[in-house]
Protein backbone atom coordinates (compact mmCIF):
# COMPACT_ATOMS: atom_id res chain seq x y z
CA UNK A 1 0.00 0.00 0.00
CA UNK A 2 1.49 3.33 -1.02
CA UNK A 3 2.19 5.81 1.71
CA UNK A 4 0.43 9.13 1.50
CA UNK A 5 2.30 12.38 1.25
CA UNK A 6 3.09 13.78 4.67
CA UNK A 7 1.79 17.30 5.09
CA UNK A 8 4.33 19.70 6.56
CA UNK A 9 3.07 22.23 9.04
CA UNK A 10 4.40 24.47 11.75
CA UNK A 11 5.37 22.74 14.99
CA UNK A 12 3.29 24.28 17.73
CA UNK A 13 5.35 23.20 20.74
CA UNK A 14 8.14 25.82 21.05
CA UNK A 15 10.63 23.43 22.66
CA UNK A 16 9.96 20.73 20.08
CA UNK A 17 10.25 23.36 17.35
CA UNK A 18 13.63 24.53 18.68
CA UNK A 19 15.00 20.97 18.84
CA UNK A 20 13.86 20.24 15.29
CA UNK A 21 15.41 23.49 14.09
CA UNK A 22 18.78 22.63 15.64
CA UNK A 23 18.80 19.13 14.15
CA UNK A 24 17.70 20.18 10.67
CA UNK A 25 20.08 23.16 10.65
CA UNK A 26 23.04 20.95 11.53
CA UNK A 27 22.11 18.47 8.81
CA UNK A 28 21.67 21.21 6.21
CA UNK A 29 25.07 22.76 6.91
CA UNK A 30 26.71 19.34 6.90
CA UNK A 31 25.20 18.50 3.49
CA UNK A 32 26.36 21.86 2.12
CA UNK A 33 29.93 21.19 3.26
CA UNK A 34 29.87 17.68 1.76
CA UNK A 35 28.57 18.99 -1.58
CA UNK A 36 31.29 21.65 -1.63
CA UNK A 37 34.04 19.09 -0.98
CA UNK A 38 32.75 16.42 -3.37
CA UNK A 39 31.95 18.72 -6.30
CA UNK A 40 34.34 21.62 -5.60
CA UNK A 41 31.32 23.92 -5.47
CA UNK A 42 31.14 27.32 -3.84
CA UNK A 43 28.14 27.31 -1.50
CA UNK A 44 26.66 29.95 0.76
CA UNK A 45 23.92 29.24 3.29
CA UNK A 46 22.10 31.84 5.40
CA UNK A 47 19.71 30.74 8.15
CA UNK A 48 17.73 32.76 10.68
CA UNK A 49 16.42 30.98 13.76
CA UNK A 50 12.85 31.62 14.97
CA UNK A 51 14.40 34.01 17.51
CA UNK A 52 16.25 35.91 14.76
CA UNK A 53 19.72 34.47 15.40
CA UNK A 54 21.90 34.35 12.28
CA UNK A 55 23.67 31.19 11.11
CA UNK A 56 25.74 31.36 7.95
CA UNK A 57 28.16 29.18 6.01
CA UNK A 58 30.52 30.15 3.20
CA UNK A 59 32.46 27.13 1.98
CA UNK A 60 35.02 29.25 0.12
CA UNK A 61 36.04 32.70 1.22
CA UNK A 62 33.61 34.88 3.14
CA UNK A 63 29.90 35.54 2.94
CA UNK A 64 30.59 39.14 1.89
CA UNK A 65 32.67 37.86 -1.02
CA UNK A 66 29.89 35.53 -2.07
CA UNK A 67 27.37 38.39 -1.92
CA UNK A 68 29.61 40.50 -4.15
CA UNK A 69 29.93 37.63 -6.60
CA UNK A 70 26.18 37.06 -6.58
CA UNK A 71 25.45 40.73 -7.23
CA UNK A 72 27.89 40.77 -10.15
CA UNK A 73 26.38 37.62 -11.66
CA UNK A 74 22.85 38.99 -11.40
CA UNK A 75 23.85 42.39 -12.76
CA UNK A 76 22.94 44.25 -9.61
CA UNK A 77 26.42 44.86 -8.30
CA UNK A 78 28.32 46.25 -11.28
CA UNK A 79 30.01 49.32 -9.94
CA UNK A 80 27.39 49.64 -7.23
CA UNK A 81 28.64 49.30 -3.67
CA UNK A 82 25.27 50.38 -2.29
CA UNK A 83 23.58 47.23 -3.63
CA UNK A 84 26.10 45.03 -1.82
CA UNK A 85 25.71 47.08 1.34
CA UNK A 86 21.95 46.70 1.16
CA UNK A 87 22.25 42.94 0.75
CA UNK A 88 24.56 42.76 3.75
CA UNK A 89 22.11 44.80 5.79
CA UNK A 90 19.39 42.30 4.97
CA UNK A 91 21.50 39.51 6.50
CA UNK A 92 21.52 41.18 9.89
CA UNK A 93 19.09 39.59 12.36
CA UNK A 94 15.99 41.64 13.09
CA UNK A 95 15.49 43.28 16.46
CA UNK A 96 13.18 40.91 18.30
CA UNK A 97 12.01 40.89 21.87
CA UNK A 98 14.56 38.82 23.85
CA UNK A 99 11.84 37.73 26.27
CA UNK A 100 10.52 35.23 23.73
CA UNK A 101 13.93 33.65 23.35
CA UNK A 102 14.41 33.53 27.13
CA UNK A 103 11.03 31.84 27.60
CA UNK A 104 11.86 29.19 24.99
CA UNK A 105 15.23 28.50 26.61
CA UNK A 106 13.61 28.25 30.04
CA UNK A 107 11.06 25.74 28.75
CA UNK A 108 13.79 23.71 27.09
CA UNK A 109 15.92 23.66 30.26
CA UNK A 110 12.91 22.68 32.34
CA UNK A 111 12.09 19.86 29.94
CA UNK A 112 15.68 18.60 29.97
CA UNK A 113 15.87 18.68 33.76
CA UNK A 114 12.60 16.80 34.01
CA UNK A 115 13.80 14.24 31.49
CA UNK A 116 17.09 13.70 33.33
CA UNK A 117 15.24 13.24 36.63
CA UNK A 118 12.86 10.81 34.95
CA UNK A 119 15.72 8.75 33.48
CA UNK A 120 17.37 8.38 36.89
CA UNK A 121 14.17 7.44 38.67
CA UNK A 122 13.48 10.84 40.21
CA UNK A 123 10.88 13.45 39.51
CA UNK A 124 7.52 14.18 41.03
CA UNK A 125 5.42 12.31 38.49
CA UNK A 126 5.31 10.48 35.19
CA UNK A 127 5.84 12.26 31.88
CA UNK A 128 3.04 12.47 29.37
CA UNK A 129 3.29 11.17 25.81
CA UNK A 130 4.34 14.47 24.26
CA UNK A 131 7.11 14.94 26.83
CA UNK A 132 8.33 11.38 26.32
CA UNK A 133 8.44 11.84 22.54
CA UNK A 134 10.37 15.05 22.96
CA UNK A 135 12.78 13.39 25.39
CA UNK A 136 13.26 10.57 22.90
CA UNK A 137 14.21 13.07 20.20
CA UNK A 138 16.68 14.69 22.58
CA UNK A 139 18.25 11.33 23.36
CA UNK A 140 18.50 10.41 19.68
CA UNK A 141 20.23 13.71 18.98
CA UNK A 142 22.63 13.27 21.91
CA UNK A 143 23.45 9.69 20.92
CA UNK A 144 24.16 10.85 17.38
CA UNK A 145 26.49 13.57 18.66
CA UNK A 146 28.23 11.13 21.03
CA UNK A 147 28.75 8.59 18.26
CA UNK A 148 30.14 11.26 15.96
CA UNK A 149 32.54 12.45 18.66
CA UNK A 150 33.51 8.85 19.43
CA UNK A 151 34.31 8.18 15.77
CA UNK A 152 36.46 11.32 15.62
CA UNK A 153 38.40 10.24 18.71
CA UNK A 154 38.84 6.70 17.36
CA UNK A 155 40.12 7.99 14.02
CA UNK A 156 42.58 10.27 15.81
CA UNK A 157 43.81 7.36 17.95
CA UNK A 158 44.20 5.14 14.88
CA UNK A 159 46.20 7.84 13.11
CA UNK A 160 48.34 8.31 16.23
CA UNK A 161 49.03 4.56 16.41
CA UNK A 162 49.97 4.53 12.74
CA UNK A 163 52.39 7.38 13.31
CA UNK A 164 53.92 5.56 16.29
CA UNK A 165 54.18 2.39 14.20
CA UNK A 166 56.08 4.30 11.52
CA UNK A 167 58.47 5.77 14.12
CA UNK A 168 59.08 2.33 15.65
CA UNK A 169 59.77 0.79 12.24
CA UNK A 170 62.27 3.51 11.38
CA UNK A 171 63.93 3.16 14.79
CA UNK A 172 64.14 -0.62 14.41
CA UNK A 173 65.65 -0.26 10.95
CA UNK A 174 68.22 2.22 12.24
CA UNK A 175 69.20 -0.07 15.14
CA UNK A 176 69.56 -3.09 12.84
CA UNK A 177 71.83 -1.09 10.54
CA UNK A 178 73.96 -0.02 13.51
CA UNK A 179 74.20 -3.60 14.78
CA UNK A 180 75.25 -4.78 11.34
CA UNK A 181 77.88 -2.03 11.13
CA UNK A 182 79.25 -2.99 14.57
CA UNK A 183 79.37 -6.67 13.63
CA UNK A 184 81.26 -5.87 10.44
CA UNK A 185 83.72 -3.72 12.40
CA UNK A 186 84.33 -6.54 14.90
CA UNK A 187 84.91 -9.06 12.11
CA UNK A 188 87.36 -6.74 10.36
CA UNK A 189 89.26 -6.23 13.62
CA UNK A 190 89.46 -10.00 14.27
CA UNK A 191 90.82 -10.67 10.80
CA UNK A 192 93.46 -7.99 11.32
CA UNK A 193 94.59 -9.57 14.61
CA UNK A 194 94.79 -13.03 13.05
CA UNK A 195 96.94 -11.78 10.20
CA UNK A 196 99.30 -10.12 12.68
CA UNK A 197 99.76 -13.07 15.12
CA UNK A 198 99.93 -15.98 12.70
CA UNK A 199 102.81 -15.59 10.25
CA UNK A 200 104.26 -18.59 8.41
CA UNK A 201 108.02 -18.13 7.61
CA UNK A 202 109.36 -20.14 4.71
CA UNK A 203 112.12 -22.07 6.60
CA UNK A 204 113.11 -25.70 6.46
CA UNK A 205 114.57 -27.78 9.32
CA UNK A 206 118.36 -28.33 9.07
CA UNK A 207 117.99 -32.05 9.85
CA UNK A 208 116.79 -32.65 6.34
CA UNK A 209 120.24 -31.92 4.96
CA UNK A 210 122.13 -34.19 7.41
CA UNK A 211 123.36 -37.58 6.02
Swiss-Prot record:
Entry keywords, A to Z: Activator, DNA-binding, Flowering, Growth regulation, Nucleus, Transcription, Transcription regulation
Keyword Transcription: yes
Tissue localization of expression: Preferentially expressed in roots. In root meristem, expressed in external cells of columella, lateral root cap and atrichoblasts. In mature root, expressed in the central cylinder. Expressed in leaf vasculature, young floral meristems and nectaries.
Major location (coarse): nucleus
CDD domains (alphabetical): MADS_MEF2_like (cd00265)
Domain MADS-box per the UniProt entry, residue ranges: 3-57
Subcellular location: Nucleus
Lineage top rank: taxon: Eukaryota
Disulfide bonds: none
GO BP term (any one): flower development
Pfam short name (any one): K-box
Cellular-component GO terms for this entry: nucleus
Phenotype on disruption: Retarded root growth, and altered root meristem size and stem-cell patterning. Late flowering phenotype.
Chain ranges of the K-box domain: 95-185
GO MF annotation: an example: protein dimerization activity
Induction, as annotated: By auxin in root phloem.
Other comments on record: XAANTAL is the Mayan word for 'go slower' in recognition of the retarded root growth phenotypes of xaantal mutants.
Function noted in UniProt: Probable transcription activator that regulates root development by controlling cell proliferation in root meristem. May mediate responses to auxin in the root. May act as promoter of the flowering transition through up-regulation of SOC, FT and LFY.
Listed name of the protein: Agamous-like MADS-box protein AGL12
Origin species: Arabidopsis thaliana (Mouse-ear cress)
Amino acid sequence: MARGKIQLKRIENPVHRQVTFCKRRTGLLKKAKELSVLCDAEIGVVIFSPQGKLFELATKGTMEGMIDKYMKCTGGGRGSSSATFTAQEQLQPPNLDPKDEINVLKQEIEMLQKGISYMFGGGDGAMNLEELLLLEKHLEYWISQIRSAKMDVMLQEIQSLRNKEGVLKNTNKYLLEKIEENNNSILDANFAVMETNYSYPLTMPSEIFQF
